[in-house]
Amino acid sequence: MVQPGSVPSLRLQELPRTPLAGEGNFVWKVPYPAGHDGAAVLKVYFGSRSPLLYLKKTVGNRLLTGRTSHMPRARFRTETECVRLWESHGFRCFGMHPEVRVEGLPEGGYMLFDWTPGLHFREYFKDASVPLEQRLATWRRFVPEWHRRHATAVRLSEPRLIHENGDVKHVMLWRDGFVYFDFEICFTSRDVRDLVGREILAYMRSVGKFFGDALYERMTDELVAHYPDKTLLLTAWEHAFRNRNPVVRAGRWLDVRLKPRHRQRWSKYEVALDIRQRLDAASLTQGG
C-alpha cells in the first residue's frame, strides 16, 4: 500500500504484463489498484527497434518530413507535452501518471497511462449492430470538436494540436465523449493550415479504407454539412493541390500523373478532389 506523500513505485520484473497493440514500443496492460478496473497501461519508449533504426528514422523525420525526433526519450517528451497541451484546450487524452516510478526502466523512457476500455472509432463505425443513424449522430457530434481543435491550432500556430498519426484508429468513444491518443511524433511546420488539410485527408482516407464506400459517402456528406468553417475544410484540397511551396506543388502534380496508386479511390488526391467537389456543390445549393 502506498503511504500518503510517498512516490508510487512498481517493479517491472514483478508485474504481470498483457501485451497490447504497439509497433516499436513495449505497451502492456498492468495491474494498478488505483486505476480503472484495477489496471493501467505501461508504455515503454525504449522498444524493440535498434538504436540505428531510431537514428535513421530521426534523420528522415528531421530532414525530410518535418517531424520531431524518433529517439526514445524525445518521443516520451513529445507525447507527454502533447497530452498536456491537448488537455489544456479541453481535448481528452489518456490520463498520465508521471508520479509513478517503475523500477527496472530508464527515467524519461516510460509512462503509466490510464486504462481506458473505450470503443475505437475503427471498430465502432463499422459495427453493424449499432444503428446507422446512431453512428452518424456520433460523427455529427465529433465534427464540431474536430473543427474546434483545427481552429485552435491555426489561431495559435500550434502544430502539436494536429494529430500526426491522425486517423480513425487513434480516437475512441469513452464515457459519452471522445478520447485521443498516440502523440509520440508531431509536425514541426508552422504552416498549420496545411497541416489541418493533411489531417482531414488522413482521417477521411481511413474512413474509406476501413468502412467502405457507402459509409464514406454518408460520413463525408455529414462532414461537409456540419464542419463549421468551410474555408478551413477546403485546406484538405489545398494540401493536395495548392501547396505554397512551388517545388512541393510540382512534385505532387507529377505524383498524380506518373504514379497509378495516386489515382486510386482512397489516395489523398482523390479524397481531396471529392471534398472539393462536395464543397462546391454545397456552395451552389446554398447560393441558389
Predicted regions mapped to residue ranges:
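Juxta-kinase regulatory segment immediately upstream of eukaryotic protein kinase catalytic domains
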Residues: 1-23
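ATP-binding glycine-rich loop module of kinase domains
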Residues: 26-75
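Active-site acidic catalytic loop and adjacent metal/ATP-binding pocket
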Residues: 26-30, 40, 148-189
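The N-lobe alphaC helix and its flanking beta3-alphaC-beta4 segment of protein kinase-like domains
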Residues: 73-86
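Conserved structural core of kinase catalytic domains
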Residues: 75, 91-138
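Conserved alphaE helix
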Residues: 134-148
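C-lobe/activation-segment region of protein kinase-like
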Residues: 179, 183-284
